[in-house]
Amino acid sequence: MIDKRDDKPFKLKSKYKPSGDQPQAIESLVDNIEGGEKAQILLGATGTGKTYTMSQVISKVNKPTLVIAHNKTLAGQLYGEFKEFFPDNAVEYFVSYYDYYQPEAYVPSSDTYIEKDSSVNDEIDKLRHSATSSLLERNDVIVVASVSCIYGLGSPKEYADSAVSLRPGQEISRDTLLNQLVDIQFERNDIDFQRGCFRVRGDVVEVFPASRDEHAFRVEFFGDEIDRICEIESLTGKTIGEVDHLVLFPATHFVTNDEHMEQSIAKIQAELAEQLQLFESEGKLLEAQRLRQRTEYDIEMLREMGYTSGVENYSRHMDGRSPGEPPYTLLDFFPEDFLIMIDESHMTMGQIKGMYNGDQARKQMLVDYGFRLPSALDNRPLRREEFESHVHQIVYVSATPGEYEMSQTNTIIEQIIRPTGLLDPEIDVRSSMGQMDDLLGEINQRVARDERTFITTLTKKMAEDLTDYLKEMGVKVKYMHSDIKTLERTEIIRDLRLGVFDVLIGINLLREGIDVPEVSLVAILDADKEGFLRNERGLIQTIGRAARNVDGHVIMYADKMTDSMQRAIDETARRREIQIAYNKAHGIVPQTIKKDIRGLISISKTSHNDISKEEMDYESMSRGERKEAINALQKQMQEAAELLDFELAAQMRDLILELKLMD
């Protein structure tokens, strides 16, 4: 039985106190949650401290909370911030554990079967296990997740029921414990002691939980009774202290007992017979042979090992679900009365909606051509309506809430005031006639003041032509296009901040990590061309890029005023008016945000000094040199992950993949 520690409240630690309109936003959100309001929107302008407000709300309502972001980088940033705010509570990180993932697929036009290929990040796998075990053991839990949280995970009941509970004085033989550990997918390894392993030394069993990376546990027996349980350092074996209760959760999230396994195998065999009969009646003999061979091999592995590669494709049978029934996900590990917060909801909710369709199209092809049983279709992400069925209470957080969020609630809490006193930028609308000369004059003014400029265009050709023109005019300019890899992108932003160049041109400059305080001018070309990047939401996001500088200014070049432009201008003016009034009433003088400039990632070669990426010619490196570079990067990636700098770790991961693809 798992003893759930449910009496520990969230304790927020911060040197800041709520300011601006944060107190009003916090109070409104908390009152609405405690009053039973199901959905509400926190409409927070860029730079107003939305994460701090979210933390205050969590500490006051005291509910287990799931925070969902739309990519790993943002999830990592939020995780780091919440860890600082709640050092005494369980702040967990749950994203896809693949550094690299090529899903299983079949392309009938070329008769090409692509086998699943992946590289699992051990650190993230540990954090995923830490998240699920924390949810089952305690209530003071915040899980920061990507949309991976809506993918199938295995039954929380099986996961909890399979847990091994140990106490000093408990009557259990050493061999019984060893068998129980094997049943929950722990491996015996007396040499290489790592996560998900155990080792045996006489009457002493040492176990390394899947959710830990530095600490393991030593269980000492006296006959058929546990004499003592100690927490130890996994590397040195040094005792940290005694524990009075140890719960060991399975080493994999897909786990089942022997009885359920045989029932599951019987269902798999029945489905196989049915599908083989269908293929043979349609004359699809190759597909039938392919399916029989693969499925029978998987069944043999399940019987002998309790696990097989791709076991998740049989999850419907393992979980005892009906066809079409949604899979268990991370959301099922939470208690019923939990809180969901959706960060950047205008992006994240769109992702949640789109995950299901893409997954089904790929898997249907595998089923049609005999690579998988039809039940594989039920190993899938949740549909949006299935996600909604898990929602007890939800807060959508965005500077520009989407239509979906607005349709879910009329309760909108605004957070417009920035603690720094910074205002939303002033906006000019100018004719596109003579825009190049006008823009050049504006850029030169910024260069003279050591400030930077963003220019956003709608087409690649326009961006390239503008880059060439500005270079001819003597402007230090760069164009950031979609082919640029993550690490190069980070270097470009860094060089812009350092003044290596003064102007950055791009098509979509809304992506994360583009907040540059040195930017005082944002120029929007073709502002009157309605579409994804020129709708009201896209324009407000782009305008926000100039809201980090006290001299922030936006110029829209257009031949007519569109409805989207007018709404974006009106909304910005409304916010600016509120901000000016607040600053005047409280004697606040706006100041440009001060933000440290992170150094470049460098790769240490054995016989050379540290060499940054831009100084290295990877293509001219020998295979051996590239291997050394990869090994050095992997070490630095692990160090970054241990320091909870997942943004840096993700950049290193991307560079490692680039290097591997060169071999």
Swiss-Prot record:
Record SUPFAM superfamilies: C-terminal UvrC-binding domain of UvrB, P-loop containing nucleoside triphosphate hydrolases
Domain UVR: residue ranges: 627-662
Chief localization: cytoplasm
Coiled coil start-end: none
SMART domains per record: DEXDc, HELICc
Single GO BP term: nucleotide-excision repair
Domain Helicase C-terminal: 435-601
Signal peptide per UniProt: none
UniProt cross-references to InterPro entries, sorted A to Z: Helicase/UvrB_N (IPR006935), Helicase_ATP-bd (IPR014001), Helicase_C-like (IPR001650), P-loop_NTPase (IPR027417), UVR_dom (IPR001943), UVR_dom_sf (IPR036876), UvrB (IPR004807), UvrB_inter (IPR041471)
Cell inner membrane listed as a keyword: no
Cellular component, GO annotation: cytoplasm; excinuclease repair complex
Helicase ATP-binding domain sequence ranges: 31-271
Family: Belongs to the UvrB family.
HAMAP family xref list: UvrB (MF_00204)
PANTHER family: UVRABC SYSTEM PROTEIN B
Role this protein plays: The UvrABC repair system catalyzes the recognition and processing of DNA lesions. A damage recognition complex composed of 2 UvrA and 2 UvrB subunits scans DNA for abnormalities. Upon binding of the UvrA(2)B(2) complex to a putative damaged site, the DNA wraps around one UvrB monomer. DNA wrap is dependent on ATP binding by UvrB and probably causes local melting of the DNA helix, facilitating insertion of UvrB beta-hairpin between the DNA strands. Then UvrB probes one DNA strand for the presence of a lesion.
Domain notes for this protein: The beta-hairpin motif is involved in DNA binding.
Subunit structure: Forms a heterotetramer with UvrA during the search for lesions. Interacts with UvrC in an incision complex.
Listed name of the protein: UvrABC system protein B
Species for this entry: Streptococcus pyogenes serotype M49 (strain NZ131)
